[in-house]
Amino acid sequence: RGRIHGRRTSGELLDDLTAAVKKRASRQESALQSALRAEQWFESICRQLRRVQPAVQEGAAGEAVQGPLPQPSALRADTPLQTLDTFCVLALKTTGKHPGRDELVQLSALKFRRFAPETILTVSIRPEKGLTRYAREAGVTDSMVASAPAAAEVAASIEAFLGERAPLVLFQSEELAFLPAAGIGCAGEGRTVYDVQSLTGKPDGKAPTLAEACRDLFSFTPELGGTEQEALACGLVFCALCDRTLHLTKKSAAR
């Protein structure tokens, strides 16, 4: 049979398909390589953080800290840059969603200076009521808390690290209530709190997860295995939001 004019042979179609598959595979390989480089970059930052061990006051007793918590603040173009010179990012793991009933079992506080992560304090806390399925699903194990201090024994050390004035940054600001419930003061006079999930809200009104926020802003999703990784990821997302809102890159280039 002769070839019908205008139609392509099966061989030509196969060649085109093969070329398309190779092109797509090349793009996928490039994307994977980029994601791998981004993950390695993220892990290297995490390794380079200066780690602070909390002082443990054995036998210290405590009780819930009373008083209202600060409401989340907006991030605006006129937010004074000097107010963000130092801020602290908090990432928590708990035994449930209710501060009045559930307990804090792990905390990481990561201090940023001039939008660079510097120092991190991480501590596991022994829950009085024991671990729950909720905590285990979040990655907390019995071995992490078996010999951990009680919240009251590390409260003073955590409070000292947080200070009284530096803004606090959380992915979900309502989690801040777990600190005073555990006897850890965090609501100093004039304390500013930023809710990163709200600040990264999507146009459709859906609240992104931390992993989704990272993917949307950085085109990669870091491995969020513990509170240290979560605090770093949350802090980097917040820095990106500050850059977008306050035009930090342009201001730096203009100097």
Model-derived regions: residue spans:
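Active-site catalytic microenvironments for nucleophilic, acid-base chemistry
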Residues: 182, 216, 237-244
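Short glycine/threonine-rich catalytic loop with a Thr-x-Gly-x-Asp
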Residues: 206, 224-229
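Cysteine endopeptidase catalytic domains of the caspase/legumain-like
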Residues: 220-225, 254-255
